[in-house]
């Protein structure tokens, strides 16, 4: 509570007005509990951590959608405030989705297919579990912010985007795994990982994205395989080795 007291007080000021005190019992006074999850979640957090994250997400969506400043959080939430409040949002994801066990249970299947697809692209021959045919230059998977958080937690990856907190889960964000081959070499494949997303201000202003004015990109260091350099390139063989170590085969479905 102490670590996030200032952000919680700020959120309460936005929700309840000057003084930050509700007319009745505060929804943030009840204890946090860890309960069995539903649908695609192994566990669920209930209580103030969950509620604060949900409230923050609503305010972020108001801002990103271009609502008038007087209407975002009843005129009490600007871009700077939202940057601070994102710490509450990311706290929930860090505990519920990035913690290794739920990340492994929920992310092993997706991670396995990603690795198989990279290996297939390098080999040029079909690999069981790969997505798309050999020779496909790009594969796009549409999912949820929980999928991104699961993969991040599974590999121990972290990223940062200007105007946010660590490991932001922003609308339209994407984890990107690029397969590269160095010029003049026939078999030296490596993986370059990054998180790409529009900044909140780009969303709010409906900025046209171009090569000259791109979305924000955060290169990602993958523990156990990434090397030095600004892009943290990882040899494909090392990336696969790390992936096979953290992926639990019992949660892999070859056809899903």
PLM features: residue spans?
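Signature for phosphate-centric chemistry
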Residues: 1-139, 143-256
């Amino acid at each position: 509570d102490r670590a996030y007291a200032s952000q919680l007080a700020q959120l309460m000021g936005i929700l309840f007005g000057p003084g930050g005190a509700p007319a009745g019992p505060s929804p943030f006074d009840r204890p946090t509990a860890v309960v069995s999850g539903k649908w695609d979640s192994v566990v669920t957090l209930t209580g103030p951590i969950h509620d604060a994250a949900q409230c923050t997400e609503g305010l972020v969506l108001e801002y990103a959608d271009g609502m008038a400043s007087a209407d975002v959080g009843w005129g009490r939430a600007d871009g700077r405030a939202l940057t601070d409040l994102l710490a509450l949002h990311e706290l929930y994801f860090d505990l519920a989705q990035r913690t290794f066990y739920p990340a492994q249970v929920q992310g092993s299947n997706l991670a396995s297919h990603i690795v198989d697809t990279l290996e297939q692209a390098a080999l040029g021959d079909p690999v069981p579990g790969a997505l798309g045919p050999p020779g496909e230059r790009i594969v796009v998977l549409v999912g949820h912010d929980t999928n991104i958080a699961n993969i991040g937690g599974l590999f121990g990856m972290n990223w940062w985007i200007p105007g946010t907190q660590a490991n932001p889960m922003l609308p339209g964000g994407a984890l990107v795994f690029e397969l590269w081959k160095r010029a003049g070499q026939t078999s030296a494949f490596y993986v370059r990982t990054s998180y790409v997303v529009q900044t909140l201000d780009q969303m709010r202003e409906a900025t046209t994205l171009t090569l000259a004015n791109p979305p924000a990109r955060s290169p990602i260091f993958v523990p156990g395989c990434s090397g030095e350099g600004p892009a943290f390139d990882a040899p494909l063989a090392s990336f696969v080795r790390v992936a096979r170590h953290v992926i639990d085969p019992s949660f892999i479905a070859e056809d899903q």
